[in-house]
Amino acid sequence: WYHDRLYNFGFDEAAGNFQNDNFGKGGSAEDPVLAECQDGSGTDNSNFSTPPDGTSGRMQMFIFDFPTPNRDGSLDATIVLHELTHGTSNRLIGDGNGLIWDEGGGMGEGWSDFYALSLLNSSNAFPPTAEYVAGAYATYQFAGLTDNYLYGIRRFPYSTDNSVNPLTWADVDDITLN
């Protein structure tokens, strides 16, 4: 589903998409995404390693072990789509090597959240002022919190309503920017 939607947006063979057979349409073939569910090499996170076109991307989704019972990150659609979008943006910018600095990583996080949340929302389901939460299932009651289903993996849900998400540029920590 994600592959087909992004293909329609232009992430096709020539752009470096992830697929086994490129059907002679450009790019390098034999590079499907290797999705590892319940990967045992970590907890409470997920990631996507993006090599250049022609080599499979590796998506690892871990168990979130702070909620009780544990929750599987691969069952949270926002996490899966978020990680797949890291693969997309990393392939499109520098063929796997373009978003390696702090600013690029920050942009990648934002794009990945945006695509995950927008692909799961129909155009008229909710207004921009609604609350859009990334990682709500996997992080529910994470570390003893009882209301983080409203926040997920971010400090506030995404929204254009300042009473829902009050963050502005003034909230950026200038120490981390130096």
What are the residue ranges of the model-derived segments?
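Extracellular zinc-dependent metalloprotease catalytic-domain scaffold
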Residues: 1-178
